[in-house]
Amino acid sequence: MYDLTYRPRRLRINPEMRDLVRETTLDVTDLIYPLFIVPGEGIKKEIDTLPGQYHLSVHEAVKVAQEAYDLGVRGVEIFGIPTYKDEQGSSAWDMSQPVQQAIKAIRAAVPNLLVVADVCLCQYTTTGHCGMIDDHEILNDETLPLLCKVAVSQAEAGAHMVAPSDMMDGRVGAIREALDAAGYTNVSIMSLSLIHI
């Protein structure tokens, strides 16, 4: 007979085997649905630059999260637009702001849905940058404690996972330390490379 040491046909013998060893699959349960939370009530306004996506008030976000879960989506990521902005972006860690309120409300209404929260300052600062700025220079190390405050506030609100989207060096390690120190050792950190495929 033939001297065939490599016989890939073995891995194609039936559908179950092929499913088991296939390289890549994508299912609705692999997706995380983005929710863009805004202040106010009864708001569901389409985002011009993201057709099919909406700015949502907290109550509307809860409804969309439930719909997504009912369709098989197992996670949402919360992005926010605050009621106020300042130089530090302090509304990003304010527990009364839309992101933290949406996290709480979604967790209460759809308890089995994974809630991921975006960690950044750009939406919350008057400069629109993800870091503190002094004389046109990003203050990397001074920004890290602020990002930590954001992540801890999101964990306190009930986020299962935080996803830093800023560009500060050392942010993941700093956030991990802050979450652990605050007692949120089971809150995960997700890389942005996993979000945008």
Where are these regions (language model features)?
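Conserved, mostly hydrophobic/aromatic
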Residues: 35, 61, 118, 154, ...
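Hydrophobic faces of well-ordered beta-strands that scaffold small-molecule active sites
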Residues: 31-34, 76-78, 115-117, 162-164, ...
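Short, well-ordered coil/turn segments that N-cap beta-strands
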Residues: 28-31, 72-74, 110-113, 158-160, ...
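N-terminal amphipathic alpha-helix/helix-capping segment at the start of soluble metabolic enzymes
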Residues: 1-38, 42-43
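Glycine-rich, proline-tolerant flexible connector loops at the mouths of alpha/beta enzymes
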Residues: 45-53, 74-98, 164-172
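Alpha-helix-loop-beta-strand connector modules within alpha/beta enzyme cores
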Residues: 89-117, 171-191
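Active-site mouth loops of central-metabolism enzymes
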Residues: 44-60, 131-145
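Conserved small/polar residues in nucleotide/adenosyl-binding loops
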Residues: 195-197
